[in-house]
Amino acid sequence: MSIGRNTAIAGVTLAAGALLLTACSPDESDNASPGADGKKVELRVATFPPGADKAAYDAFAVQEKQFEDLNPDIDVIGVEYEWTGPTFAVQLAGGSLPDVFTVPFTDSKTLLENGQLMDVTEEMKALGYTDKFNPVILDGVTGSDGKIYGFPRQAYAMGLHYNRDLFEAAGLDPNKPPTTWDEIRKDAKIIAEKTGKAGYAQMAINNTGGWQLTAETVARGGRTQEQNADGTFKSTINNPATVAALQFLHDVRWTDNAFGSKYDLDWGTINQEFAAGNIGMYTSGSDVYTALVRDFGMNPDQYGMTVVPNEGENAGTLGGGDIAVVSPTVDSTTKAAAVKWIDWYYMQKLMNEDAAVADAKALSDAGQAVGTPVLPVLSKDLYEQSLTWIEPYINVPRDQMTPFTDNIWDQTPVGEPKGQTQAIYGLLDPVVQSVLTDKNADINALLTKADTDAQALLDK
């Protein structure tokens, strides 16, 4: 699930959107290229979530000018944007959706099924890098018709984020973060006792509770669903790994009193609490550092990241990401401009040295994060080469992230569940909340019901 991870965790209720497309579909007879009629094409592009600092927009202004200098027939208009699945259909119908925006991998399948993404197959082929993508990642933007509906732009793996100051205040070594779930629990208890802060916290609402419970199930070797040979799915929520993940939460909360007092956190609020120094550790995507500093004001010196402990047979690390897409309502002139922007703004910096350096310089000059750990959507070799290109501009404290960057390649990446992803995440939210708010919650009973409800969704 990611970008600002707000984009990667919101629930999806898009059924109405499919009905709206007929009324707002573009006129495909208009095959003009950008500016072909002598007029500038106005292109509305997504920028940042509400709350982004001025420096982020300063950097964007530099990049906007660079693009417009290269494409004088296109007028880029930045639009404040935050992905929220439940409002997507309304934005689509009301015309408030940017022409270019990003959506998480987990939601792209739903949008594809509803016909709510623009086909960019030929455009990607013309750009010449369709075959450069990791095939597993490209599959996430490929419809059942074999066509491509977006540009994978970044991916992440789950990480354990920790506050170095709280570690030091508790007498723990921030350069030696926990490597097992038992050690996480032990350190969380020490942090809570020594500092009065939450030693460990976890998301629990707006589908993020299910997202993180799934991640911690995978880390213990379990899976919440299986795909059958005929393409159908079987729910496997009630498994030993999920039971263990919930028992861990119960013990941190009720036995150790190390969870703090907030049991209704989501991606935004847990980041806010962590950035404010109120949480010792939590799990989230490895790319969250940028948002923590840019949107939530975290002091970089306080930040640390390590891998999520993998324990048991078939253990892995949940990953996700997001894609850049074109609104299905635009005409072909705007579509052509949109693809130019996506190629320039999102893609070229992943594979072209000059573009990577220009992007890194613009961000660095504006005080924005450069070098936040991500997973490559292309090849690992190309990703590592790109880090050498931008090395002079890297300003994130990567030495404080080496427990993650040194070990993530040894873990097995696992994609998010494909069947009814967000809906089932939503089903699991109350399970997490129950364990955190009811000392006597019956974990097996909760998971049995969730399994039944999830299977009903998968059978639709």
Q: Which functions belong to the PLM regions below?
A:
Residues 2-110, 125-129, 174, 333, ...:
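Conserved N-terminal structural module of periplasmic/extracytoplasmic solute-binding proteins
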Residues 121-133, 177-179, 200-202, 222-244, ...:
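Short, solvent-exposed loop/beta-turn-alpha elements that line the ligand-binding surface or hinge
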Residues 187-188, 231-263, 308:
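Glycine-centered hinge/linker elements that transmit conformational signals in sensory
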Residues 292-298, 313-318, 326-426:
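C-terminal lobe and pocket-closing loops
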Residues 105-158, 212-219, 302-306:
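Hinge/lid segment of periplasmic solute-binding proteins
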Residues 144-153, 158, 168, 182-234, ...:
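Extracytoplasmic/periplasmic solute-binding protein
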Residues 59-62, 244-248, 332-345, 446:
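Short amphipathic alpha-helical coupling segments at ligand-binding clamshell hinges
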Residues 79-88, 179-186, 261-275:
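Short helix-initiation/N-cap motifs at beta->coil->alpha
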